């Protein structure tokens, strides 16, 4: 998949999670999902950094919604992209 296709898929999953009435999401989690969705749609951020920002909120939501297949699958995607944000933060620093 190309970059735009990945971003579109990521944003579709965010949209599904945000609008799923069966999920018990906190206000801060919903707010962060909305912020990252807006930033991605305006090209102010990338998938890696959005994954980094969403991870703590969605991890807690997954604990509250253990039976959610949608959230579990999306967490796998988040974990896949999150490590790239860590490398982007660490590599520019001097050792």
Where are the regions that the model predicts?
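Short terminal alpha-helical segments
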Residues: 1-29, 34, 86-94
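Generic hydrophobic secondary-structure signal
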Residues: 14-17, 32-33, 40-41, 54, ...
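A structural signal for well-ordered alpha-helices, especially hydrophobic packing surfaces
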Residues: 18, 37-44, 62, 78, ...
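Mature extracytoplasmic domains of secretory-pathway proteins
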Residues: 25, 30, 37-42, 46-49
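Short acidic/histidine-centered micro-motifs embedded in hydrophobic/aromatic stretches
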Residues: 32-36, 74-77
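Short, charged early-sequence alpha-helical segments and their helix-coil boundaries
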Residues: 42-77
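Short, functional C-terminal segments
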Residues: 69-95
């Amino acid at each position: 998949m190309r970059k735009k296709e990945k971003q579109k898929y990521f944003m579709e999953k965010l949209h599904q999670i945000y609008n799923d009435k069966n999920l018990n999401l906190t206000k801060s989690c919903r707010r962060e999902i909305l912020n990252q969705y807006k930033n991605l749609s305006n090209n102010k951020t990338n998938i890696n950094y959005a994954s980094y920002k969403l991870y703590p909120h969605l991890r807690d939501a997954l604990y509250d919604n253990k039976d959610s297949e949608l959230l579990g699958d999306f967490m796998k995607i988040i974990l896949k992209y999150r490590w790239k944000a860590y490398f982007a933060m660490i590599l520019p620093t001097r050792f």
